[in-house]
Design a protein with these regions (language model features):
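Sec-exported extracytoplasmic/periplasmic mature domains
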Residues: 5-12, 66, 70, 90-98, ...
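Post-HExxH zinc-binding segment in Zn-dependent metallohydrolases
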Residues: 43-45, 76-121
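Active-site-adjacent structural elements in folded domains
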Residues: 24-26, 48-51, 73, 122-131, ...
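Extracytoplasmic/secreted envelope proteins and their assembly/folding machinery
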Residues: 4, 58, 83, 87-90, ...
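Juxtacatalytic substrate-recognition/specificity segment
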Residues: 1-78
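Amphipathic alpha-helical substructures
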Residues: 103, 124, 131-139, 143-188
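Long, well-ordered core segments of solenoidal/helical folds
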Residues: 61-62, 66, 108-121, 163-171
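Secondary-structure capping and boundary motifs in well-ordered enzyme cores
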Residues: 49-57, 78-85, 127-137, 171-174
């Protein structure tokens, strides 16, 4: 509930909708998001893996906005944005929602730096080859934007304001965004 509360607050979301979470009892790793649901396979939660469990839940839930509603006009060149920005928001809400301590957030940023160093192409040319470098490099771009937005507005706006602007300029996701929409939402 804290994850959902933190993400809906970030998005300024007040609508009440049905969203299903499917947790099959399969010892595997990963999740897949759909418009009104996601499935998540992971080993049973323990104290040791609780931050990883919570992060994947937060990541897949945020795809409700940044994938199911907000979609790029070109799928392949926007994967870094959809996955990386979603990963950053997941990391952020663990801290802001008091699901995990700030040290977990800082650890995630450190791991993103390590993973992003393995990137062998530009983000927009990575295509559909998902993996840690894509998620992490995109998350670092999101982190940079969040810091820049907060600094430019003396803390009055953040990455959530950017996403709310992007929803607005795409008519709540009815229209797929172009890079000009991203720029417009960032500068609004």
């Amino acid at each position: 509930t804290r994850i959902i509360a933190a993400e809906t607050a970030l998005m300024g979301w007040t609508r009440r909708e049905v969203y299903n979470v499917v947790l099959p009892p399969v010892a595997d790793t990963g999740g897949e998001a759909y418009r009104q649901s996601f499935a998540y396979c992971f080993t049973d939660p323990t104290v040791a893996n609780a931050p990883a469990w919570a992060n994947t839940l937060a990541h897949e839930i945020f795809h409700y906005w940044n994938y199911a509603r907000l979609k790029g006009a070109d799928y392949a060149s926007t994967q870094w944005f959809q996955e990386g920005f979603t990963e950053y928001v997941a990391n952020l809400v663990l801290m802001t929602g008091k699901v995990a301590p700030p040290s977990v957030f800082l650890g995630k940023l450190s791991k993103h730096i390590e993973n992003a160093a393995k990137l062998t192409t530009t983000l927009e040319n990575i295509g559909t080859r998902k993996g840690p470098p894509l998620y992490s490099a995109g998350a670092l771009v999101a982190f940079s934007w969040d810091v820049a937005i907060r600094r430019a507005t003396a803390g009055r706006r953040d990455i959530g304001a950017f996403f709310r602007n992007l929803l607005r300029v795409t008519s709540d996701g009815a229209r797929r965004y172009a890079w000009s929409d991203i720029r417009g939402a960032l500068e609004a």
